[in-house]
């Protein structure tokens, strides 16, 4: 295997890979050719992701597995399902999309994850974790029903295996004796370090004290018996089978093999070739290294989970700053430009707030489902380890865990991405809201998130949160409001959510205090022409709303609170303006604008309303600015929509 210390600056020579337009080309490759193909695939993957940015470490770790699977299986007739999809870049390259990799995660280009309408080789669309075994089982049972002899394989990581859904599928597959192969890609990592009983079980079982004591005592006894020690060595693997991961999976009805080296290509090919044709549920456990072949990624698998295209780098340290010239020291202070503060990421605002609040309230508990880094809980986890819980990829459990803590007068804060809260929705309703429990939800990645596409956009949360009785829903316009709203939600005696977008805010100065913003009170940011237009903006839409208000001499209200709405502000706007325009970075159906419509209808107020938000569709991948423009939610799109409505209204008068 070729190892790399830096990402290739030029496209590497890949003569064998260039001949593989489809996976069928791999079927006749010998062992030498497969090894060459794997090396070329890894080199091309490094170059490609270095040019575009994207998910990095996971794909490098499954190069050999991907080559072996497409060598053995007759895809797409045989079904191959990748869990999550972070590791699917090598699969995309081998399935006819090599020349399109330069467009991955870009507007109009290849998707970040497997996608059914992108390629027949992508048998199941993914993005969230732990769905692969259920989907593959469905395909296997459908093949049985139709009398088709097709092989079905699911590839799942050890992080995704921590979710209950994966075990539900394993139990069912064993019960119905399905013809399918499950491959556990065990790299001891998910996005953050793996936690939970399963990760600990897989890691510790063969080095546990009872097992090692039994083994050493047996060796001492058997060493006095001729030939017995050699016999013990030969039977040790059978003893391991009594206490190894095989115990768990074989009790579920699977034939367990492993663990084997997931980078040993000949062993992979031989093992997969044997297992793929066996009847019944098969389970192959492979051990891999995330970032394999690129030394910096092997050393820092979390940091190299994904990279940007600017990180074409190396293991070398950053360049040193040039020393200041002697003349610079004598320059007048007034001559130096005053550095502008960099806009802060919303997740960093949350990370600082939760540490500050924890310092003054010992009841605060921080909970996250495997998103410590993304939610910026690293500092909190270190300063308050006894009050920090990473529950792994278990969103349902995270929400109900918080509910249980709230029952005991604790103050849990659940840090979760908008798209992943969808997985804990029943628990949010049944376990938190019905009981009016005091749980705060810090909802990150609200609205369009960019290159990861429709499975990761936070487009639905305003709609599914607003309809829950007793729920408080707040949407900050900037970093300062985000901190103040987190305090407001935390002090509210019931379920409350603050939803904020990915990335940086507009650069507003953030206070260091913990003062709360009043709930349900809008802010008038601009008073426009009476009888004209009023823009009612929620959250991130206050940015473009400010621009449009200036162009149209319109009133601009920062609504702040999605639920409850500021009744008085809305009624006043309806009284003084001919057109109300609601703006939200969420789907219109059931969202904040719908709430305004419902309030006006309940009050019997007749005024023209234009609701602008994300479309009734799944928004594709691309840069957030591109996506918002495509949805008509940039300043130009909003202005055009408002002017068009005004022209239509005048024509009807």
From Swiss-Prot:
Give the record's cofactor note, including how many are bound: Binds 1 Mg(2+) ion per subunit.
- The answer to whether UniProt assigns keyword Metal-binding to this entry is yes
Q: Name one Pfam family in it.
A: DXP_synthase_N
Binding-site list for Mg(2+): 158, 187
Indicate the enzyme's highest-level EC class.
Answer: transferase
The cofactor(s) it depends on are: Mg(2+); thiamine diphosphate
Q: What residue range is the signal peptide?
A: none
User: Which InterPro entries does the annotation name?
Assistant: Dxylulose-5-P_synthase, THDP-binding, Transketo_C/PFOR_II, Transketolase-like_Pyr-bd, Transketolase_BS, Transketolase_C
Which of this chain's residues are annotated to bind thiamine diphosphate? 86, 127-129, 159-160, 187, 294, 395
GO annotation terms (biological process): 1-deoxy-D-xylulose 5-phosphate biosynthetic process; isopentenyl diphosphate biosynthetic process, methylerythritol 4-phosphate pathway; terpenoid biosynthetic process; thiamine biosynthetic process
What is the designated name of this protein?
1-deoxy-D-xylulose-5-phosphate synthase
- What broad taxonomic lineage does this protein's source fall under? Bacteria, Pseudomonadati, Pseudomonadota, Gammaproteobacteria, Oceanospirillales
